[in-house]
């Protein structure tokens, strides 16, 4: 900041998107809080769990760390496929208002597009929320087009930053999405093509998990959205990095989870 202080962003629910790590202006720009774990009772006996926000820990950080300048959460989450509940969103929003900081919601996989959510979840917005969306999860990552819904002050600030950093903005993405919206094609595309495709893949993955790991102490994070499977090897005797190396020797590729915390 202009006064020499460093501001930081709080992730109230880890694991979180590892790509954020390279976006900070300083090495300690991000603070993350580990989740509570809720073991789920599934109707078919599938061993699943869900990460939930530890709100006591979140408020403790907000109350004692004046460097926190924003809350940030992805919904659905890369890498777990977690979709925080409507109640969790409301609670985060209330905390953001209480401590006079914005709530950033990374909505790259969410509604209304690409709409890759497989559970009940409502999209919410107010002037204290910064809602971010992307065309990349529609299969158009090369267009490098993002959409930010925020109050006028935030949008003007982003415009000034882009004016300084982006000398030749990409016009293809905005033009394409404008046409899709104006002609009423975008939402049907998401509902009738994108969502069924990925939901079917998720159901296949869950069935394979149940078959392969039925007798092992392995749990699957409930697939509520996005494109990922997150496995918890409960009581594992080795670290995730070592598991990654051992599986790679067998031509099986995973991503070790410790980097996302």
Q: What is each residue range found by the language model?
A:
Residues 1-98, 104-126, 130:
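Conserved core of the PLP fold type I
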Residues 5-12, 25, 35, 39-42, ...:
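Conserved core segment of the aminotransferase class I/II
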Residues 12-14, 72-75, 104-107, 133, ...:
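Short beta-strand segments
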Residues 192-206, 218-233:
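Conserved glycine-rich beta-strand-loop-beta hairpin in the small C-terminal domain of fold type I
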Residues 217, 230-261:
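Conserved C-terminal alpha-helix-loop-beta "cap" of PLP-dependent enzymes
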